[in-house]
C-alpha cells in the first residue's frame, strides 16, 4: 500500500488477510505500507517479491514514476479513475455511494496478466476502461 493512509487501509487489509487466512499459491500474504513512492534506487529492494501494488489517492500524480508498475506480473491498483486512464490494471472508484472497479485490459496485457472472466461478468460492480471514452 503506497501513499498517505489516512483511513488505515493497510491495517484493515492485513486484518482481513489474517482473519480469513488468505494465501496466494500456498504462500502467506504480506502487507507493507509506504507513505510515498520510494526513490528508484530503493524501489527494487523494497518491492522485490511484490505481486500487487495498491496506490492510494495521494499518489495519483506520482504513481507512474514507480518503475515497478512496468514489471511483468505485478498488478497495479489505484484509488481513483486516473489510475486506469494512465495504465494501471484497476482503478477503484466511488459511484453513487458504491464502489466500482474500472478495469484497463491494456494495463493487464502489458504486465502479462489476465482478467478473470468471472470478474468481468460483474457488470454492476465493474466497468471496462476504453481509451478516449
Predicted feature locations:
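Short hydrophobic alpha-helices and adjacent helix-cap/hinge residues
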Residues: 1-133
Amino acid at each position: 500500500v503506497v501513499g498517505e493512509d489516512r483511513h488505515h487501509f493497510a491495517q484493515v487489509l492485513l486484518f482481513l488477510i489474517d482473519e480469513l487466512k488468505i494465501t496466494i499459491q500456498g504462500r502467506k500474504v504480506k502487507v507493507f505500507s509506504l507513505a510515498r513512492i520510494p526513490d528508484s534506487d530503493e524501489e527494487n529492494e523494497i518491492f522485490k517479491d511484490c505481486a500487487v501494488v495498491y496506490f492510494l489517492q495521494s499518489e495519483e500524480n506520482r504513481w507512474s514514476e514507480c518503475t515497478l508498475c512496468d514489471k511483468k506480473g505485478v498488478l497495479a491498483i489505484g484509488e481513483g479513475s486516473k489510475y486506469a486512464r494512465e495504465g494501471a490494471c484497476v482503478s477503484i472508484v466511488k459511484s453513487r455511494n458504491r464502489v466500482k472497479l474500472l478495469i484497463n485490459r491494456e494495463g493487464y496485457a502489458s504486465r502479462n496478466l489476465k482478467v478473470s472472466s468471472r470478474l468481468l461478468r460483474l457488470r454492476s460492480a465493474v466497468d471496462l476502461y476504453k481509451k478516449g471514452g
